[in-house]
């Protein structure tokens, strides 16, 4: 290969200073530098010999390189060296002579490529291009194109003709020390005879010749090393050239195109020497790496054959470009070259990557040889020439070239190149006013590598193309004035700033970083990517990158979504008369982009402090106006910057609900729609408020007749005298906020209620007062309902249409015709209300609302047909809270008329007119009334009205003193059964097996009950001989048919013989009365003490302790009875048991051992040792079985009651009370409600839930409306909630 040709072409082709690439041609001998006055493109399709070239007359044929079209480079005589100063080195001359058979053109092309690889910043072009994967391709031109060159005289400018299809040799070859594989003769420069070489050496001027040494970064001695990678001998030219011109010449884009394989033939034919100055200057100022060959080692674009459209395109532009070049001035051309070169630069890569890719390219080039000569042919502006074989790749490359974006630092005008030249602060900014031509189409100068934009390869190629115009960036053709402005500021701005670190900063030296590269590979680079829009839609002054980087605040997702919503765009055009803002970051506080742009600019220019001062002054004016309204209406004191009284006195001014203002026709700068107003409007719109009727843009139009501060307020006209003061405005705004807050609280409350309703069973804690827990209704129950309940206006009356039987304690039982007062509606199905002083919930379908005008009168029911009146004795004083309640004093005898519900009786006091209802717990029921068609009430033995006030009864007087674990401590005290103990869980009960601490002097309305029959008449108590063989109690002739139930943990007790009976002193005796709810109470009267068997006082403690031990031992010996509900056992009877033929009475054995010992006092057990006639078995306990129930009822009605004596009151009424509650219909009995057996196992999901296993017996205390039950497991003694569909009622 001809090293001469290579050396010369290298110097000129890329237009870069080889010294910047570390090549020291210029440094070696600055005299070698010469100026190229013109670049001529000679489109010769086929150049067989030198004679076929159309050459200028002044061209030196010895300086000609021919090819498929040639570029003639004329060395200007102004910078031309003497012929003697440019002799070829003997080495190079010998090389030419010794290699006649080798293709001179590839060597020339390679040398040019080496020159192009030199970077003005010192970046090694080979490494940069190698990092991009570009492969230089060699045109496969016949070697017979060699020309006989004759040396021209030294006086005429040197003309260097280079083929249009000079292609950079493989970068990989640069990395190797051997010359590239011969690719066939290209005929660039024929083997030049020694004489020709001596006379006029072919060592062409390199760009180092035109670059001052102080601008060449890389050590000049490194050029031979780099050049020697492929053409070591060729790359070194003797130091025979003239010194470089003082002007720092940017390399011409045109020459760079000539030097680039991908820009093959892209050399613009220019005749002016200023173009060369521009060329060299721009190449100094830009990285030559911007022009790599298209192909990468791993590129998806394989080589394509060279096609003639390139030549056609060159011919098309040659004349225009020649004229433009001749008209351009050197400095402006240089600056434009800088501008245009930066965008087309490809990303530099780290030296390591460059070396690897060069090695790859080298190996690939060795293999592919000639087929890679034109990997992707490029036309003059960098567009790859289409090839039928690679049409898809061609389309891809074309699309990316068309849609490239200009890369700029966001802070500056997007039309300024982002690459900075700190070394060139002295570059003047002169505009090219003399370029009248703007091409109608623009193409990028180079084809970026396929990965340059897609896969975030190391760097992005710059986005400014080398167009023929050399002044317009890639995006759009520019007018002359616009380009002048851009070119004028470009160099200064870039030189004044430092480059930003490249994304691959860790792999590059700082000298290889360009600030037009994305910051870092890990940084989101979407803003650097091309948008899918045509480049012709690009508008000056618009840059998405610029606006994106200018965001000075965080944008909320709502704002960003706002502009993207199609409905918003549509309504924006309707409301504002124009499309919505392009970018959401136009929405800045105090600056609403919806408003007209010119208005926004005006307001932004205002001084905020001035506006504040003016507003304050205006507010004072408004206050004065409102205080002393006069005929003269001040002109918009909040608007005009200098408040003044208008000479005209309009009767009305435009106003909103919150502010009354009058806008001057000239739109004074201090108007109410200042920054603060915009901020309010903006916030209102973003928060979902309505857009003002005339749109936000109407608020700031100078011609607008009015303004409003609140975007949601309806506009109307009001008299000027009624303008609101600032205080009123603030107050109304505050009221609106409070209203909004109230709405939010209500919504929150409803949400909480919904959440609570979803799991109403959680946290159920039975309470004496209100069974509807706060957890269920949330904040609604925080309101004091007592006042509402006292006032009739707050409670709406309703009448029950059907009988409603309560299934849980929180439900309110109703009979048809009852009048209830509704407090509130719980949900769509349930009301909460009050009936006869009791509060509860009931279904709305069971009642009918009464009209407010209608007086709430209960329906006249058919009179209750009382078959037999009952009898009771008052145990406590009772003061009725309502008119329907009857007050009485302790000890009074009450005639029972009927049982209103499970907790209330209706009765009257004989001899008086007092009649009403009263709670069962306040009386000892001696005899139950018999009525026709009695109502079956749920058997809740220890329930009472939850709404009963504390004044009606001595509540909780001894609640904390009911139980003591030491029975012996109170041997002589009179103990009473306390129902409250049944509200605690079984686990607690098991810990309190002792006898009650002292007698309960006053019983309270009980807690929600445990199941029925947990307390029994002590007539039926017996000690098991196994548990206490030494002690027996003489009891009536009763045998137990014991079927254990979920609550029974003890075996039946044997009835001991009567000879074990003891007598008790009359003072320690008490008659035993069972009240309606199963409680055993000791009345104050001792009239029946003579009828009781008596025991020695000293034995009471032992009896209790024996009972406790008996129950405990039985529960331990027979644990299977907890789970079994199917076994019956006959109680062992005492030896002296009377009435052996007495009927066996079935009972519900729901009594736990701890319950009995805990709930029964000594006196109660003794008092149950009645005389035989008082404890006859004919007094049933209320069997759980329908059959026994019928039997009991029959006996009861058969005349037992008629023959009853007063002495029998204590024991005989209990069976009646029990049997009355138990009917053949088992659906509502307490046992059904409160004793359940688990069908499935249940694993708790929350802390308050109860674990169930298949077959577990659970004592249910409450059923929640959501289907969950609350109860205690017999097996685990744990208390909690569980799903109701996991259990089934346990029938005994």
Swiss-Prot record:
Compositionally skewed regions (Pro residues) per UniProt: 240-252
SUPFAM superfamilies assigned: SH3-domain
Matches recorded under PROSITE patterns: SH3 (PS50002), SOHO (PS50831)
Residues bearing PTM Phosphoserine: 86, 89, 242, 259, 341, 350, 369, 374, 465, 472, 481, 556, 609, 640, 665, 713, 945, 953
Domain SoHo: 366-469
Listed name of the protein: Sorbin and SH3 domain-containing protein 1
Example of a GO biological process term: cell-matrix adhesion
Polar residues: bias regions: 114-128, 266-275, 437-450, 955-971, 1106-1117, 1162-1172, 1211-1230
Start and end residues of each SH3 domain: 793-852, 867-928, 1231-1292
Keyword Repeat set for record: yes
GO molecular function: actin binding; cytoskeletal protein binding; insulin receptor binding; signaling receptor complex adaptor activity
Species of the source: Homo sapiens (Human)
Residues carrying Phosphotyrosine: 536, 654, 937, 1240
Comp. bias regions, Basic and acidic residues: 93-102, 354-365, 510-534, 1119-1136, 1192-1203
Subunit structure: Interacts (via third SH3 domain) with the Ten-1 ICD form of TENM1; the interaction induces the translocation of SORBS1 to the nucleus. Interacts with INSM1. Interacts with the long isoform of AFDN and with VCL. AFDN and VCL bind to SORBS1 in a competitive manner and do not form a ternary complex. Interacts with ABL1, CBL, CBLB and INPPL1/SHIP2 through the third SH3 domain. Interaction with ABL1 occurs only after insulin stimulation while this has no effect on the interaction with INPPL1. Interacts with the insulin receptor but dissociates from it following insulin stimulation.
InterPro entries reported in the protein's UniProt record: Endophilin_SH3RF, SH3-like_dom_sf, SH3_domain, SoHo_dom, SORBS1_SH3, SORBS1_SH3_1, SORBS1_SH3_2
Function according to Swiss-Prot or TrEMBL: Plays a role in tyrosine phosphorylation of CBL by linking CBL to the insulin receptor. Required for insulin-stimulated glucose transport. Involved in formation of actin stress fibers and focal adhesions.
Location within or outside the cell: Cell junction, Adherens junction; Cell membrane; Cytoplasm, Cytoskeleton; Cell junction, Focal adhesion
SMART domains: SH3 (SM00326), Sorb (SM00459)
Domain of life, source organism: Eukaryota
Post-translational modification: O-glycosylated.
Disordered: annotated span: 1-29, 73-158, 214-275, 318-381, 405-534, 628-650, 692-716, 944-976, 1041-1064, 1106-1150, 1162-1230
Biased composition (Low complexity): 74-89, 944-954
A GO term from the CC aspect: flotillin complex
Modified residues (Phosphothreonine): 82, 344, 708, 862
């Amino acid at each position: 290969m001809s090293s001469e040709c290579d050396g010369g072409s290298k110097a000129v082709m890329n237009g870069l200073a080889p010294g910047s690439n570390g090549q020291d041609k210029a440094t070696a001998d600055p005299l070698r530098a010469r100026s190229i006055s013109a670049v001529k493109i000679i489109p010769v399709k086929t150049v067989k010999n030198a004679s076929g070239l159309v050459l200028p007359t002044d061209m030196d044929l010895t300086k000609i390189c021919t090819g498929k079209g040639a570029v003639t480079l004329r060395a200007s005589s102004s910078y031309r060296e003497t012929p003697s100063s440019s002799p070829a080195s003997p080495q190079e001359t010998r090389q030419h002579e010794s290699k006649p058979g080798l293709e001179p053109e590839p060597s020339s092309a390679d040398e040019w490529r080496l020159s192009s690889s030199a970077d003005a910043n010192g970046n090694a072009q080979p490494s940069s291009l190698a990092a991009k994967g570009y492969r230089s391709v060699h045109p496969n031109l016949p070697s017979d194109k060699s020309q006989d060159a004759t040396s021209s005289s030294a006086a005429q400018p040197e003309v260097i003709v280079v083929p249009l299809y000079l292609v950079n040799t493989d970068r990989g070859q640069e990395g190797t020390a051997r010359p590239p594989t011969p690719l066939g003769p290209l005929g660039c420069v024929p083997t030049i005879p020694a004489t020709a070489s001596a006379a006029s050496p072919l060592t062409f001027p390199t760009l180092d010749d035109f670059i001052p040494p102080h601008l060449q970064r890389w050590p000049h001695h490194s050029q031979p090393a780099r050049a020697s990678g492929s053409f070591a001998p060729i790359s070194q030219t003797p130091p025979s050239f003239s010194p470089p011109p003082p002007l720092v010449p940017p390399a011409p884009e045109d020459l760079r195109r000539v030097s680039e394989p991908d820009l093959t033939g892209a050399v613009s034919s220019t005749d002016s020497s200023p173009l060369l100055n521009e060329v060299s200057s721009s190449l100094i100022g830009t990285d030559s790496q911007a022009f790599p060959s298209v192909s990468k080692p791993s590129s998806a674009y394989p080589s394509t054959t060279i096609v003639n459209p390139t030549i056609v395109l060159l011919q098309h532009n040659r004349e225009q470009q020649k004229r433009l070049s001749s008209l351009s001035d050197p400095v402006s051309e240089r600056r434009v070259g800088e501008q245009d070169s930066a965008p087309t630069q490809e990303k530099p890569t780290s030296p390591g990557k460059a070396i690897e890719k060069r090695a790859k390219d080298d190996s690939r080039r060795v293999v592919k040889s000639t087929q890679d000569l034109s990997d992707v042919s490029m036309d003059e502006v960098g567009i790859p020439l289409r090839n039928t074989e690679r049409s898809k790749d061609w389309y891809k490359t074309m699309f990316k070239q068309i849609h490239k974006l200009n890369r700029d630092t966001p802070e500056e005008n997007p039309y300024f190149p982002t690459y900075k030249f700190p070394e060139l602060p002295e570059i003047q900014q002169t505009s090219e006013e003399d370029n009248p031509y703007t091409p109608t189409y623009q193409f990028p100068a180079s084809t970026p590598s396929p990965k340059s934009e897609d896969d975030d390869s190391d760097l992005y190629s710059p986005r400014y193309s080398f167009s023929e115009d050399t002044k317009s960036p890639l995006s759009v053709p520019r007018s002359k004035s616009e380009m002048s402005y851009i070119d004028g500021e470009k160099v200064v701005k870039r030189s004044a700033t430092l480059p930003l670190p490249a994304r691959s900063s860790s792999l590059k030296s700082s000298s290889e970083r360009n600030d037009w590269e994305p910051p870092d590979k890990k940084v989101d680079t979407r803003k650097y990517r091309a948008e899918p829009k045509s480049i012709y839609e690009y508008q000056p002054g618009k840059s998405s990158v610029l606006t994106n980087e200018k965001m000075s605040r965080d944008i909320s997702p709502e704002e960003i979504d706002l502009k993207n919503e199609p409905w918003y765009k549509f309504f924006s055009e309707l409301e504002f008369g124009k499309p919505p803002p392009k970018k959401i970051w136009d929405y800045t506080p105090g600056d609403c982009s919806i408003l007209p742009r010119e208005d926004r600019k005006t307001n932004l220019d205002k001084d905020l402090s001035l506006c504040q001062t003016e507003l304050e002054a205006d507010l004072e004016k408004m206050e004065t106006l409102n205080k002393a309204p006069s005929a003269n209406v001040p002109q918009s004191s909040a608007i005009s910057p200098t408040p003044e009284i208008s000479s005209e006195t309009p009767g009305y001014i435009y106003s909103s609900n919150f502010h009354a203002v009058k806008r001057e026709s000239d739109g004074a700068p201090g108007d109410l729609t200042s920054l603060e107003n915009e901020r309010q409007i903006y916030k209102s719109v973003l928060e979902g408020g309505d857009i003002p009727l005339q749109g936000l843009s109407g608020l700031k139009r100078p011609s607008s007749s009015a303004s409003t501060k609140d975007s949601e307020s309806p506009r109307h006209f009001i008299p000027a005298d009624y303008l609101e003061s600032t205080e009123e405005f603030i107050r109304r705004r505050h009221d609106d906020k409070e209203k909004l807050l109230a709405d939010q609280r209500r919504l929150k409350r409803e949400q909480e209620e919904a959440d609570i309703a979803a799991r109403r069973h959680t946290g159920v804690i039975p309470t004496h007062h209100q069974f509807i827990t706060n957890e269920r209704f949330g904040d609604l129950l925080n309101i004091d309902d007592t006042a509402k309940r006292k006032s009739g206006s707050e409670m709406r009356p309703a009448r029950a249409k059907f009988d409603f039987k309560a299934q849980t304690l929180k439900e309110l039982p109703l009979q048809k015709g009852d009048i209830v007062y509704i407090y509130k509606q719980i949900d769509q199905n349930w009301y909460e209300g009050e009936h006869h002083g009791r509060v509860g919930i009931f279904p709305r379908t069971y009642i009918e609302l009464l009209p407010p005008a209608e007086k709430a009168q209960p329906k006249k029911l058919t009179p209750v047909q009382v078959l037999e009146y009952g009898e009771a004795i008052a145990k406590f004083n009772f003061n009725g809270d309502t008119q329907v309640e009857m007050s009485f004093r302790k000890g009074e005898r009450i005639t029972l008329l009927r049982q209103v519900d499970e907790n209330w009786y209706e009765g009257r006091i004989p001899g008086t007119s007092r009649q009403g209802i009263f709670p069962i717990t306040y009386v000892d029921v001696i005899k139950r009334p018999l009525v026709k068609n009695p109502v079956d009430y749920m058997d809740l033995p220890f329930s009472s009205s939850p709404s009963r006030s504390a004044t009606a009864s001595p509540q909780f007087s001894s609640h904390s003193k009911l139980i003591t674990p030491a029975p012996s401590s109170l041997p002589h005290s009179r103990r009473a059964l306390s129902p409250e103990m049944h509200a605690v869980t079984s686990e607690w009960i098991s810990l309190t097996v002792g006898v009650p601490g002292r007698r309960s002097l006053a019983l309270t309305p009980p807690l929600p009950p445990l199941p029925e029959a947990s307390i029994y008449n002590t007539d039926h108590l017996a000690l098991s001989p196994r548990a206490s063989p030494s002690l027996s109690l003489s009891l009536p002739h009763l045998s137990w048919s014991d079927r254990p139930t979920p609550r029974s943990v003890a075996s039946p007790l044997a009835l001991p013989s009567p000879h074990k009976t003891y007598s008790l002193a009359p003072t320690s005796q008490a008659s035993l009365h069972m009240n309606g709810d199963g409680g055993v109470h000791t009345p104050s009267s001792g009239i029946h003490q003579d009828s009781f068997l008596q025991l020695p006082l000293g034995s009471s403690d032992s009896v209790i302790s024996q009972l406790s031990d008996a129950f405990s031992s039985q529960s331990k010996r027979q644990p299977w009875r907890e789970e079994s509900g199917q076994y019956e056992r006959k109680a062992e009877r005492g030896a002296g048991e009377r009435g052996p033929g007495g009927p066996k009475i079935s009972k519900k054995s729901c009594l736990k051992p701890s319950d009995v010992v805990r709930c029964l006092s000594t006196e109660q057990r003794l008092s149950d040792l009645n005389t035989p006639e008082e404890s006859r078995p004919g007094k049933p306990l209320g069997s759980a079985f329908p059959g026994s129930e019928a039997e009991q009822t029959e006996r009861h009605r058969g005349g037992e009651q008629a023959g009853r004596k007063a002495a029998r009151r204590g024991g005989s009424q209990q069976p009646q009370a029990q049997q009355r509650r138990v009917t053949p219909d088992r659906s509502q009995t307490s046992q059904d409600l409160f004793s359940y057996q688990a069908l499935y196992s249940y694993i708790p999901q929350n802390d308050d839930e109860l674990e169930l296993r298949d077959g577990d017996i659970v004592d249910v205390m409450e059923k929640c409306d959501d289907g969950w039950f609350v109860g205690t497991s017999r097996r685990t003694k744990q208390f909690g909630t569980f799903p109701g569909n996991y259990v089934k009622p346990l029938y005994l």
